[in-house]
Amino acid sequence: MHKEETFNQCALTINGYKSEVKKTYELPGDKSVGHRSLLIGALPKGEYKIRNFPQSRDCLTTLKIMEELGVKVKVLKDYILVNSPGYENFKKKIDYIDCGNSGTTSRLIAGILAGVGVETNLVGDKSLSIRPMKRIVDPLNSMGANIEMEKDHMPLIFKGNGELKGIDYTMEIASAQVKSCILLAGFLSEGVTKVRELSPTRDHTERMLKYIEGNIKIENKEIEIENSTIKSKDIYVPGDISSAAYIIACAILGEDCEIILENVLLNENRRKYLDLLKKMGANLKYLEKNQCNGEHVGNILVKSSFLKGISIGKEITPYIIDEIPIISLIASFAEGKTIFENVEELKYKESDRIKAIMVNLKSLGVKTELVENNLIIYGGLSKINKEINIRTFNDHRIALTFLCSAMRNSEKTYIDNWDCVAISFPNSLNYFKDFFRIN
């Protein structure tokens, strides 16, 4: 059982690029922080404001689910006002909860549902319904949850046990979503939960829990959490650093571009793709300005650049998992080859992103190889200059990535389904119209 896709399959045609762009931008709120501003921000009882909440389809899905649990949300001009009854008073029985396309929503809310003891069926769309869930169900059930599923996929049937015990858990894969699920369930459990990471992953959950004064301790790769008194606090969602990647790519690939992105999330783990682009030779600088709810925020300056290929080790891959498609495209226009180590997790995203990258780069004339889970991009492409058809595989990051290829194509670029971009970057054409001639 799954919810059917709702995309309208609307194609997009790009009629070439603009050679010069000089502009300053502010971006919609970061999707990862946006999810957590509700999922974690609404755990304590009380009222708070969220500024710059992203309007992406995934984040709106999270908002709807929190309302179903009993959280009241009022959308005002400059912020959204959240009034939460507190996790102790969340509704305990809901027929089903639909996570749409959002893997983050499904895995994080699963930890909360298990910890609170909600009886429900957790479902998603066709894409989400084939993504692996055993990785969260097994640790939750070992804590005392009662969750059933068929094979490794949604729907997840929560029996509403609600009496979890802390767990000592060593991560089997590098996944911020799995880690976050266990930490949230651990916070809502009796006793201490310890999570050990094989390699570090994104830490937005830890930062947000610490911001609302949760009892969480972090030492090297071990995280320890237990239930404690927490407080409602206002949250500002910095500009989305993942969406920024596509605008940055357009500027790098452009002939004469210079852009500034203001008030962007500069979390140390999330900005690693910027460091990789700098290593490749990108004319790129970022400057931290301040902190908001435990996250670093600042500005990014980018200019058109000539790049060289690099090798990206497996220890870096978990940090840049969402940016590998766009770095792969940029690497196609770099001198030499670029190697991404241990990219297997890309198979389990909204699409098989390894396949999507290789299929579309081939259509551009770029040679790629997959050798023992290492993705190799052979650069050297200068211009495309032919009509190309991009297959998005209904994946927002693939659509956004290969839109950027049009910065080197004087002919038409056709994208088969642009509507899927609403998952993460709605109204993105308001930004990209500065770079492209768009039908």
UniProtKB/Swiss-Prot annotation:
GO molecular function, one term: 3-phosphoshikimate 1-carboxyvinyltransferase activity
Cellular localisation: Cytoplasm
Keyword Hydrolase: no
InterPro entries according to UniProt: Enolpyruvate_Tfrase_dom, Enolpyruvate_Tfrase_sf, EPSP_synthase, EPSP_synthase_CS, RNA3'P_cycl/enolpyr_Trfase_a/b
Residues at which phosphoenolpyruvate binds: 31, 103, 131, 177, 353, 397
GO BP field: amino acid biosynthetic process; aromatic amino acid family biosynthetic process; chorismate biosynthetic process
Subunit structure: Monomer.
General function of this protein: Catalyzes the transfer of the enolpyruvyl moiety of phosphoenolpyruvate (PEP) to the 5-hydroxyl of shikimate-3-phosphate (S3P) to produce enolpyruvyl shikimate-3-phosphate and inorganic phosphate.
Family named by the database record: Belongs to the EPSP synthase family.
Protein name: 3-phosphoshikimate 1-carboxyvinyltransferase
Organism of provenance: Clostridium tetani (strain Massachusetts / E88)
Gene: aroA
